[in-house]
Amino acid sequence: MFKVTFAFENGSTVEAFANAGDNLLEVARGANVAIDAPCSGNGACGKCRVQLKGGELDSKKTLHISDEEYNAGWRLACMSKITADVEVLVPDIASAYKSRMKVADLSSKEEIAIFEKAKHEVESAGIELTNSLDVIEVHMEEPSLDDTMPDNERLTRALRKYMNLKHIRIPYSVLKKLPDVLRNSKFSVKCVVRTTPNDMFVYDIFDSKEDVVIGGLAVDIGTTTVSAVLINMESGEILAKSSSGNGQIRFGADVINRIIESQKPGGKKKLQDAVIKETINPMIHEMCRSIHFPEQQIYRMCVASNTTMNHLFAGINADPLRMEPYIPAFFKTNSLFASDVGIEINPDAHIIMAPNIGSYVGGDITAGTLVSMIWNRPEFSLFIDLGTNGELVFGNSDFMMSCACSAGPAFEGGDISCGMRATDGAIEACTIDKATMEPTYKVVGDPGTKPVGLCGSGIIDVISELFMTGIINPKGKFVREGKRVRHDHYGMGSYVIAFEEEAGSVKDVEITEVDIDNFIRAKGAIFSAIRTMLNSLDFDVSMIDDVYVAGGIGSGINMANAVHIGMFPDIPLEKFHYIGNSSLTGAYLMLHSTPAEKKTYELASNMTYLELSTVPTYMDEFVAACFIPHTDTHLFPSVMEEQQKR
């Protein structure tokens, strides 16, 4: 056995032991060391970079590590085997997805405006903002020798007087508290309850003098990013908001790699722990700590995620999803409780899940569709959720059709050499001067934050600017020379947005021809899915009245740039609307409003699912879309006209 020491830039270390020949990335995973590996350790992405500080490794040479970097000790963890005791440095950029959990500043009106707008819109559509949770104050006669009724029956009798229900359930967690709370309060208590027409469930019990807030948790589990809000269930007020990288990402950037990993011995538990123990629970703790809110007072949770994430969250085998005929274990389920999956809130908290529509169109889309309001408008609208799985819904108040395309993780920074989530240090907007080829960019974070990488919106801007200024051609190849354009000894071109001395990372922030090619395929998947779905309905893009774009890829997408690269159709820009993380907003509405929850189930039931792989023309559409903006430039007249003017 050899000792493997993982050192971090903050000075901390983690030690593990491994056998000769063990893969370094697998050793890191076993030691719970977070190293970003979107390609699941296939050597394709180049993101699992570590620096050899002592000892030896048997490492394969790779195009992702230059000779200069190799001589400085840089290696890919997935391409390295243990041969002796070794110490490696794990740079912050390699574990950024985990280390950069962020609790939002709710003093900013922008953070809550989108939720308030969504509440107003669904309420205007006749959906009441009410739910089944309540606080009931109960006063009981104290026991005596003449009244020896046990505590639980005494409470049940009092509650039944308040609401004439036949079935009242008091769980073990409340039963444990009952003797002390009743006597300390002199039998005057407040109960947190869930009431239906037939029964009541008692979640908690307090002294009647206490102020009791009913907490609720809405969570969007994205393949790359997890976002959550903690709310007051009675008022709908957002108490705290947080986001973090999905801890599962070290097992692969896409759902297929995650499913494959889950089939290994102990795999389902590893994937479930990565998203719950390593991601969601720390987010809960941090949100509650920031506002001094008891975690045990979160009594309800709503999860919105794609179909695969739903299964992995629940610890259910997802393997049938990747094989024909692509059958999930469930589309809808209401049988989960916090204690079932290890969510560290009230153990009896009920977990509701936004319903899935198909094997690759999940609850995140039904929740987002609720927010988009296309179901309440006569105009034809298109809803697009930009994530690792690109999902679309088209329709109006009469019909809706959905489909999914495998866009890959590029929109959230995956498959891009300097890609990252939209967190501190991410370049989220960029322009390039045509004459000087010099960039001007905006970085996520406080003023003065140095760039570390590119998030989705920044990638869109950079590629658009490179194309519109003639630095790259429609194939994404560099055709102009300059200080920031360079080619390696293999001939691969790249453009440097921030040199190492300008950046907050250990290398230049750049975008390569391989990155551009990966992104062209991602945007091509979106555009070809739009064309295929519209063609199946005999619709033309000119018939689209509004396009609602969702996804946590930055503070907002420059819609003009998205059209320039051929990701969205060439229609008037005023038709595009960015609605942020609609999955989280929809989960919030479902959590706060039982009628909104019911409406979401109705939307899922009434939506037609189009399986793109069964459409003969889809692959032709995809191949045609893998140019900037498209092989058929007549589809993008305004883009070609503007490029000529520049």
Task: Label every PLM stretch briefly.
Residues 34-59, 67-84:
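Local cysteine-cluster metal-coordination motifs and their immediate loop/turn environment
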Residues 66-72, 76-218, 223, 235, ...:
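Nucleotide/phosphate-binding catalytic cleft detector across ATP-hydrolyzing
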Residues 138, 295-306, 463, 541-551:
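Short glycine-rich phosphate-binding loop at a beta-alpha junction
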Residues 219-223, 228-256, 320-335, 367, ...:
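Glycine-rich phosphate-binding loop of actin/hexokinase-like ATP-binding domains
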Residues 247-289, 415, 426-431, 518, ...:
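N-terminal phosphate-binding loop and adjacent alpha-helix
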Residues 306-320, 491, 539, 551-570, ...:
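Short glycine/threonine-rich loop-to-helix capping motif typified by GTGT followed
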Residues 396-398, 539-603:
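Catalytic phosphate/nucleotide-handling subdomain of diverse soluble enzymes
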Residues 467-537:
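A contiguous, well-structured pocket-lining segment that forms one wall/lid of small-molecule binding clefts
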